[in-house]
């Protein structure tokens, strides 16, 4: 319903945002940390996914202005382009966070394989998620699978790789726990976190998945 041939990533995002608001999202993006106030998420199309960002998010994107270098930048959604939709909505005052990937036509086999690896990471991390599990262990599960599949250089970015694969979510989009290799925190009952294993394929775009889990 949102996509039309010839549109840009910005036009695609406007259509998604409109539907989010019409379905109850209040349009608030609340983040913890200085200079983390952005809009309702990001659309990363094609090579724009390779652009690093100063924000502490999984991936970057050039954005429409240097004052907010993140997300959609006017890229034309053409044949062979991967489109990562990472939009944050609300249920009452609580944040939601989900990522899905679409494509215009066929992508490269490497992109499809990397996306499947992201799904495998999600399943293996979910299997290991229980109270008492160390956040660093969950990150290492993800990183080791990426390494085994020869995709370490693409994992969580290329030019600038994020050093986490998941984060807590609640009133703010980025709460504890954070799934990083150096975290000493353990999961507690009823924690909620978003898991987002992603890969950037140069010349194609970003692939991967993001879903939220209750411990």
Identify the residue ranges that each predicted region occupies:
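Active-site neighborhoods and metal-handling regions in enzymes and metal-associated proteins
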Residues: 1-215
